[in-house]
Amino acid sequence: MRKPTPVLKPLMLAATAALSMLVAPAMAWNTLDGNAPLVIAHRGASGYLPEHTLEGYAKAIQLGANYIEPDLVMTRDGVLVARHEPVIGDSTNVRSLAQFADRMTTKTIDGVKYENQFFVEDFTLAELKTLGAKQTRAGRPTEFDGQFQIPTLDEVIALAKAKSIETGRTIGIYPELKHSTYMQGVSQSLGFGKTYFEDKLVSTLHAAYGNTGTAPVFIQSFEVSNLQYLNTKTDIKLVQLVDADDVNADGSLSLVAPYDRPYDVAVRNGKLTFADLVSNVGLSFVATYADGIGPWKPYLLKTVADGVDRTGDGVVDGKDRRVDGSTGVIENAHANGLFVHTWTFRNDASMLGYDNPQKEMEAYLKMGVDGIFTDFTDTGVAAVAAVPEPQTYALLLSGLGVIGWLGRRRNKA
């Protein structure tokens, strides 16, 4: 539904040049729109409280999140709820509830077999509401396990709107359609239409925010065809997620199934890989149906495992990787009019090239990412605050950023 408006580009360049003569030389935010990067609460304040709970989202907002992220799956009675996966045997206390013991089964999702598990589509919303959410990552607080319910999308939206009024700042939501190909099969098996999952999301968001690209909402997915479909149904901002299996010693990305390509591509025996999506040609393709990309962070900053113990702790691990700088993906994405929101930053894991989580985030912010997903909202907020920004210059440029943002339109499919 959107495509670039090229007439604005000369205007923006001329205005920027004029401003540069009026303001002392300085660096503003190197983001697509010139505004400060977003801090996106990955699954809520999941570093502190059980993920995808209203309490976790509220905590993230209290810590300063700009957006909260509900991953979405669907119940047996067609309600969209927030869970990271359709699999709920480990993220809830369902295994301890005898009345649901007969729901344990084995299913395959995106080529991966889940044995002796419980699946959200086998429960009604009323049944899910009797479960309690649990912490899913080892080493994190567990004292709240079982205390918080699984929220619906409607409840997440209501929370964001209420907190926006309470705090006086706009709190957005960043829903992800989880495993769309799988959920389309679920929809059909339950008697709903093939695109019910996507259509239900769109109708819910339009009712809450309207059909506009300025809504405080992003819709994200690792698949392609569902985003292309959504591009024909909504003006709400769309984000193509980009995955990989691992990062190699030389800094390249390992592409091993099922993390080598979007699953809707895989089921058609297509050749398009995730790495292809962040090539120059791939980014041009993504710009025809989406507004931004959400790549795993090693796609953006090259780090190399060269065997040097840089932290001096006697163990050579990911934190010791040599940082070689930008891969160029951010710059190329911006050149294609795409913003870049990267993931996932954690205080307790997954640091590459840094032994301080805030410093790692700062490195990506300085490269120009437009947003960061983190389990620890407070660290993300501190990282944004720590990156210098001349206020006067930034405010002037933010006005130009709005012009550029409004001028960009996705191609109509």
PLM features: what roles do these ranges have?
Residues 15, 26-386:
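Phosphate-group recognition and catalysis centered on beta-loop-alpha active-site segments
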